[in-house]
From Swiss-Prot:
Catalyzed reaction equations: 17-O-acetylajmaline + H2O = ajmaline + acetate + H(+); 17-O-acetylnorajmaline + H2O = norajmaline + acetate + H(+)
Catalytic activity, EC: 3.1.1.80
Keywords: Alkaloid metabolism, Glycoprotein, Hydrolase
Role played: Deacetylates 17-O-acetylajmaline and 17-O-acetylnorajmaline, but is inactive toward other acetylated alkaloids.
Glycosylation: residue positions: 39
Organism expressing this protein natively: Rauvolfia verticillata (Common devil-pepper)
A GO BP annotation: alkaloid metabolic process
Transmembrane segments: none
A Gene Ontology molecular function term of the record: acetylajmaline esterase activity
This protein's name: Acetylajmalan esterase
EC supergroup of this enzyme: hydrolase
């Protein structure tokens, strides 16, 4: 048995990665971040 936890990056990570960026620009990246987390989850489950 194993337990693993994956999730989207936190607010601090977003603030660090995208300083001085408009929220609209940051929102562009949300689907890519979500897809990366979903893909990683699928790989771990396999």
């Amino acid at each position: 048995n194993a337990l693993f936890i994956l999730g989207n990056i936190g607010n601090n990570d977003v603030n660090y990665a995208f300083p001085d960026r408009a929220i609209e620009e940051i929102r562009f990246y949300v689907p890519f971040i979500t897809e990366a987390v979903a893909n990683a989850t699928r790989e771990i489950i396999r």
